[in-house]
Structure formats: structure tokens, C-alpha cells
Amino acid sequence: MSSARDLIKVDIEWGMERLVRAQQVVELRPYDIESWSVMIREAQTRPIHEVRSLYESLVNVFPTTARYWKLYIEMEMRSRYYERVEKLFQRCLVKILNIDLWKLYLTYVKETKSGLSTHKEKMAQAYDFALEKIGMDLHSFSIWQDYIYFLRGVEAVGNYAENQKITAVRRVYQKAVVTPIVGIEQLWKDYIAFEQNINPIISEKMSLERSKDYMNARRVAKELEYHTKGLNRNLPAVPPTLTKEEVKQVELWKRFITYEKSNPLRTEDTALVTRRVMFATEQCLLVLTHHPAVWHQASQFLDTSARVLTEKGVRTSVENISPILCVPVVNQIEWVMAFAWWWAKDVQAAKIFADECANILERSINGVLNRNALLYFAYADFEEGRLKYEKVHTMYNKLLQLPDIDPTLVYVQYMKFARRAEGIKSARSIFKKAREDVRSRYHIFVAAALMEYYCSKDKEIAFRIFELGLKRFGGSPEYVMCYIDYLSHLNEDNNTRVLFERVLSSGGLSPHKSVEVWNRFLEFESNIGDLSSIVKVERRRSAVFENLKEYEGKETAQLVDRYKFLDLYPCTSTELKSIGYAENVGIILNKVGGGAQSQNTGEVETDSEATPPLPRPDFSQMIPFKPRPCAHPGAHPLAGGVFPQPPALAALCATLPPPNSFRGPFVSVELLFDIFMRLNLPDSAPQPNGDNELSPKIFDLAKSVHWIVDTSTYTGVQHSVTAVPPRRRRLLPGGDDSDDELQTAVPPSHDIYRLRQLKRFAKSN
């Protein structure tokens, strides 16, 4: 299947650099939503025949996004290309369960079929089709209501036709009032009124029969509103980006589907529960179609439902077989027929769910995830469980035919399937095919050799496979280590030592790649060899390491490998660092920790690095402490500091002159407050009239006064010798002033409070 870039074929003369650049971006990055939006906005202003290639590319890249299909169809409808509209609906309508797209479909049928003689039949079929597919949507109220209004508006001639009309309306009402949708209360009121108009006596009976199911559906509708709050059903489906918004949407969809799986309607109808869960899953796949977990979970649910129904059918057969044997032979035929009907019903439903599970997995590997091996493997295992081996072979071959994938893991799983289903000979034929594929890596030889050893119990065949792989992957230290592990497992000491010598002396491994093999060789000799062989391997390894720059001068670090065992080391982690052992072999020091043992005492030492880090505060929320000489009490959590001013207030204070620029006159605060205390104010302000000699013209006095400023007394510069010249204050980010520009203002000469304090101080002396 072609990639997303190959699906973009836009042939439009934009005439603007901005649009040309947007097209170049989407050709490079097909899922760039912003660039697509730029072109879509321009395309909506042009005729459809000029921009049809854009819309085709759009729906090919985003095949599950209902919003883009809706834009495309609306453009075709606007130009009255109804044949194209019907083809577009055939391509997308059944696959995309989006309420807005289905409403557009009903609008199209209503507009285009109104002139036909069979208009009413066409509309009724369209409504039935829509409600069958989208009727469980939480926001499908308008479709239910429109269908009811349509049926009630149909003219009925004769009693038979009238009864048919009433039956049809009642049937739709009764389905609607037990379906959890927003606005179900209004439908219930309309239904009760409808039954009252027909027959008040029957109405009460109908309401009593349906009220319990209605209350249950209304409760679920309220809960669904909560569980679906925040879901964006119109997001374009793009590959996972792990953004915060995407993670949130994934969690919301999981919560929605989990809620549906909990059977909120509390029904015993397994088919209804499965339908509702799959409806929610299908809507989720419109947005998260690039997420393989959603596809896999959907298939798992269907598979589980099929198994439950199968077990239910078996359990029913066991429970009903005893009563059949106890009845007379004459009546046993009726019992057997009833039993067969119930058993066949469950089995048939289970088969439908199993086929739907296969359909879900088939859609997943034929869609945008056609290169996802996980879904191929899950599908293959499912079909293997149904004994459809030919289909499994077809799936594996289909995946292997993709040119731009690594087929190694596919061959490994293919061999395992062939061995399980058809025996070891079939697996060997797959291994032969894998060896001939130049894309295959060393893993296929390891998998084939271990399969022969564990399944056919023939270690000689496994030896030959490993030797065959060594000719091809002798320069791969990973493959060599797998071969060594196999020989060690067999306890073949001589063969293992020979393999070490062959690999290390053949020259197939570069010095850098041979480090791991040398370390393993030393470990091997430390476990089973004598001291002379250990020292010999150490010397040979040191000779190789001398040519590597990163191992120069670390002879002591190389000695550690002789005495270590698993995660036990002869030095503490600090000492290992000091001798360069961590840099030598890349050990994880936090694993050493207390496991390191002292050479002298042998006791476990406590490593300071193993101590968990202390929690640190959020420094962005801390208040800067800036002491001021005359800080008001309570202005800061700590004495002597002040809160930073808001940005607007700080900007205003920066434009005001400094306090020492004001030289008087100064108001006597005590006299001013004494006047306020003795002042008797009326309850209400006097109204100006001729009797109290108050006139509105008095308040116009300020307008007639010309204020004269003596520029000789104040020019913006202090003339007093004792006054401290003002300094400009620099506004810092955050609305505070610079600390180095703080200054202490000179007290005014007419400060009454200061004079009184001086007099009291003189008297006390």
C-alpha cells in the first residue's frame, strides 16, 4: 500500500506564494493540519472543478475525518454534481459514524428526491438506514425527532392506512424513548401526548410498560454526557504525537469505551452490549485510527464476546438436556426443537462476533497501519485459533512483500506458526526462505537453532545452524554472544573455548566490537578455568585494550572483572568511579549502591549516591525578598520586605517624580483630623435653590480659573543644597524597581511628629 505522501496529488495553480508554500509543506509532511487548513480556506472560494484534486488528496490522507468529507460533499452539492455526491456518500457514509455527516446525507436525500413520486418511501428508507447506523449516538435526537415529524406528516387515506401510520410512529417512539440520547425527556413527553390523543386508556398502559426502560435510558444519557465531556469527535486522525492534548483525548476515549463495557443499561442482551461498545469504538477509530491499541482492544472485546456466547450456548444445552430426558417420548420432540433453537441462536451470534473480529483486524492491516507487524501477528493468531491456516500464510506473505520493512521478526514468527500448525519441516522451509532474503538479520539463525534444540531435541542440527550463521554474521558480537550462550547452556566447555579462540583470532571483529566478547571470555575462564588461564586471558585482553584510547591507563579497572559476580563488586561505587571502571564497561552505578563490598571488612557500605533526592520547591512561585527601609507591617511574609508591584502600578510609579521633589506645603495631620471629628455633615446634600443661596453656577468656578504655574520656583531640578538630587528608577521585569537605586528621602523641615519626638528626647536627657 502506498504511503501518505504518495496519496497527495494536488494539481492547482494557486497564484500565491503562501499557498504554494503550504502545498510544499503537506507534500513533505502529509499530516500538517495548519498547511491543509490554509489550502482549504482558499479552495472554498473557488469552483469545485478547480480544487477537486485538493479534496481528493485530503480525504485520501484523512480517510476517517468526517469534517473533510463533509466539506468535499458540500462543495459538490453546491455545484449540483449529484452523481459525484452519491459516489462520495458510498465511499464514506457507512464507514464514518459521524452525526453531522449523516445529517448531511438526510438533507441531500430530502433535497434531491423531493420531485420523485416515491419521495416518501425514499425518505423513510433513508431515516431507517440512518437510525440503524447512527441511532445510538448520544446526539442523534434531531434525527429521531425529524423522522417522527416526517411520519406524522404523511397523509393516510382510510382506516388501514391510518393504523399503519400510527403503528409506524409508535414503533419509532418506543425505540427512541429507550435509547440514551440527549433530549430523551422531550421525546417521552411527545410520546405520552401522542398516545393520549389516540386512546387515553391505552396511553396509561403504554406509559407504565415503557416508563422503567425510559428512566433507565435517561439515567444512562446523563452519565454519558459526563463520560463524553471533552471529547473532540472532529479531530483529524494523525499518527501519535504524544502531545498533552492528544494524551488527554486518548484517556477520554478509553473512559468512554470502558463505561460502555460496564453495561450501564444493565441488560442481559449480550448482543446489545456488544453493539454499543463497538459503536463507541468505531467512533473512537475515526479519531485514533493510527493507534494500534484501539484496533487490538476492539478485536479482543469481540473475541471475548464470541467466547462468552459460545459458553452460554453450551451451558444452556447442559441445563436443558436433563428435563428432556424426564418427559414422555411424545413431548421430547417439542423440547428438542426449542432447545435447538436457543442453542443455534447463541452459536449464530457468536459466529457473527467472531467474523466481526476478523473484519476489524482485516481493516486494521488494510488501512493506515498496513505496516504495523503487531496487528498482523494478532490477526494471524486469531485465524490460527479458527484453524484457517491458509489465511495465516497469506497474511505473513503479504507482510513480507512490503519492500521497506525489516522482515526478521516476521520470519521468526512465521517459523513459529509453521512449527505449531504443520510441524518442524514446514518451519525449516520458512527458515530456508528467510536465509535467502538479503534483508534478514542474524536473529533468524538463532531462532531456527533454538527451535531445533527445544522442539526436535537435536542439538547437532542446532550446531550446524549456528555454524552456518557464523559464516554470515561472524562480525556481529550480538550473534557471537548468542552462540556462546547456547554452548554455555549445553555445558560444552571445550567447544565454548574453541569458539572464543576462533572468533577473537579470526579478525572478523574490530577491537571496539570485541570488548564484550573479551569480557565474556574472562568471565567464562573465571568460572571454570584455573588461575593461569585467567591471567592469560587478562593479558591478551589488556593487549587489545591498549590500542583503544578510552581504555588507556585503566589496568586496575580491568582487574575488577576478574573478581565481580553478578551485581557484586569488590569496590564501592565511589572507588569504581575513581579507577574509571564505570567509564570502562558502562555499569549502572545505582545498581551497585549498597551491593558494593569493602575489600577490608566485607561489610555492605552505604552509598551516598543511593540516597533518594530530596523534594525541591517550585521556585517559580517563590516571592523575591527585597527589604525596604520603611516597609509597612504585613506587606510581606518576612519583616522588612514588600510584595512586587503589579506591572501596571509599577509602570505608573516609574513615571511619577520621586518623593523628595515635593517641598511643601505640608498638612498638619492632627489639625486636619480634628476638623474632621468636629464636622457635622447633613444626611443628604442640599439642593441648590434661591433660598439657601446655592446655585449650580458655583460649581462652574473651577472652569473659569486659570491656574498659573511659577516655573521659576520649580524647574524639575532641586535648588536646595540639603536635598538629595532625584535619581531615575529603572523598572525591572515583573513590575519591581532595582535594588541599587533605593534611597532614603530627607525628612521635611516642617515634620511636626519629628519635632515632638526631639523635644521628648531632650527632656528625658
UniProtKB/Swiss-Prot annotation:
Gene Ontology BP terms: mRNA 3'-end processing; RNA 3'-end processing
Pfam name, any one: Suf
Main localization of the protein described in the UniProt heading: nucleus
Coiled-coil spans in chain: none
Official protein name in the record: Protein suppressor of forked
Keyword list, A-Z: Nucleus, Phosphoprotein, Repeat
HAT repeat intervals: 46-78, 80-111, 118-153, 164-197, 230-262, 387-420, 491-527
Compartments, as annotated in UniProt: Nucleus
Listed GO MF terms: mRNA binding
Annotated positions of the Phosphoserine modification: S738
GO CC entries: mRNA cleavage stimulating factor complex; nucleus
Organism: Drosophila melanogaster (Fruit fly)
Assembly notes: Probably interacts with an RNA-binding protein.
Residue ranges, annotated region (Disordered): 595-615, 727-747
PANTHER family linked to this entry: CLEAVAGE STIMULATION FACTOR SUBUNIT 3, RNA CLEAVAGE STIMULATION FACTOR
SUPFAM superfamilies cross-referenced by the UniProt entry: TPR-like
Function: Essential protein, may play a role in mRNA production or stability.
